[in-house]
Regions:
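Residue-level detector of Asp-centered blade-edge/turn motifs that repeat once per structural unit
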Residues: 2-3, 49-53, 102-106
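Short glycine/acidic-enriched loop and turn motifs that connect beta-strands
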Residues: 13-16, 61-66, 115-118
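Beta-rich catalytic cores
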Residues: 16, 42-45, 96
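Asp-box/WD-like beta-propeller blade repeats and closely related beta-sheet repeat scaffolds
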Residues: 83-139
C-alpha cells in the first residue's frame, strides 16, 4: 500500500449506528476513504490490531455500557477489502470493558473493565480466535 494505511474506527454506538469502519488513509494527502463497514456488533468501543495485521479485536457492550458483561470479539481481516469476519467472542466478566491490547507476540490479549474494576487476559489461537479466559484480577 506504499503511502496507504488501513485503519479501523469504532463508533461506540448501539443499533444501526454501532459499527467498526475500515478506512484507507493516504499518508501524503491525509485523505481518508471508507472501504468497509462491519455493523453486526452492539456498542463497539476499544480496538486492538494484532501484530500480524490480519486480526482485529474489539471490546463491545451488547447490553449497553452500564448493564451486563462486556465482551471482547475477535475478527479476521480481509487484506484486500478490509472486511471483517467474526471468529468468536468471549465475556470479559465485567462492565464497561474499556481497554484491549495484544502482546507483541500476538499470543495474548489483555483487557480492562472500567466500571467493575477488573482486568483479565485471553490466549489467542493460531487462527486469531480467543481462547477461554486465562487470567482475571478483581480490584
Amino acid at each position: 500500500m506504499g503511502n496507504q494505511h488501513r485503519i479501523f474506527v469504532s463508533s461506540c454506538a448501539s443499533g444501526a449506528e454501532g459499527a467498526i469502519i475500515a478506512f484507507d488513509l493516504d499518508a501524503e494527502t491525509g485523505r481518508l476513504e471508507q472501504v468497509n463497514r462491519y455493523d453486526d456488533i452492539e456498542g463497539p468501543f476499544y480496538l486492538a490490531l494484532a501484530p500480524d495485521r490480519a486480526h482485529l479485536y474489539s471490546t463491545h457492550a451488547p447490553s449497553g455500557f452500564e448493564g451486563g458483561d462486556g465482551m471482547v470479539a475477535a475478527f479476521a481481516i480481509d487484506s484486500e477489502s478490509g472486511a471483517l469476519r467474526k471468529l468468536n467472542e468471549q465475556s470479559a466478566a465485567g462492565t464497561t470493558t474499556c481497554y484491549v491490547d495484544v502482546d507483541p507476540t500476538g499470543k495474548a490479549l489483555v483487557f480492562a473493565n472500567y466500571s467493575s474494576g477488573s482486568v483479565g487476559a485471553f490466549p489467542i489461537g493460531a487462527d486469531g480466535s480467543l481462547g477461554e479466559m486465562s487470567s482475571f484480577v478483581q480490584h
